[in-house]
């Protein structure tokens, strides 16, 4: 399954909504996503499963790229 991860790039700064970025990760569970991103210094805000019509919509975006971790 593909998950959309909303995160802040720095764990040392206070999270600000306007600075939230997102990325896509293929994993078997939310815990697997967190394990795969553990080595990165992301402040993870939310992990959302993406499937069905939502996945089709996200694929149309020019920013859609699933990370190979």
Curated annotation (Swiss-Prot):
Molecular function in Gene Ontology: DNA binding; DNA-directed RNA polymerase activity
The UniProt record lists the keyword Transcription: yes
What does it catalyze? RNA(n) + a ribonucleoside 5'-triphosphate = RNA(n+1) + diphosphate
EC number(s) on file:
2.7.7.6
User: What is a single cellular component term in the Gene Ontology annotation?
Assistant: DNA-directed RNA polymerase complex
Q: Does the keyword Plastid apply?
A: no
Q: What EC class is this?
A: transferase
Q: Which GO terms describe its biological process?
A: DNA-templated transcription
Q: Which NCBIfam families match?
A: PRK13667.1 (NF010188)
Under the subunit heading, UniProt states:
RNAP is composed of a core of 2 alpha, a beta and a beta' subunit. The core is associated with a delta subunit, and at least one of epsilon or omega. When a sigma factor is associated with the core the holoenzyme is formed, which can initiate transcription.
What is this protein's function?
A non-essential component of RNA polymerase (RNAP).
The protein's name: DNA-directed RNA polymerase subunit epsilon
Record organism: Bacillus pumilus (strain SAFR-032)
Upper taxonomic classification of the species?
Answer: Bacteria, Bacillati, Bacillota, Bacilli, Bacillales
């Amino acid at each position: 399954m593909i998950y959309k991860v909303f995160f802040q790039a720095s764990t040392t700064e206070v999270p600000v909504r306007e600075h939230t970025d997102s990325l896509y990760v293929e994993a078997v569970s939310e815990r697997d996503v967190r394990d795969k991103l553990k080595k990165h210094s992301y402040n993870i805000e939310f992990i959302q499963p993406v499937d069905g019509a939502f996945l089709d919509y996200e694929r149309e975006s020019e920013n859609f790229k699933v990370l190979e971790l």
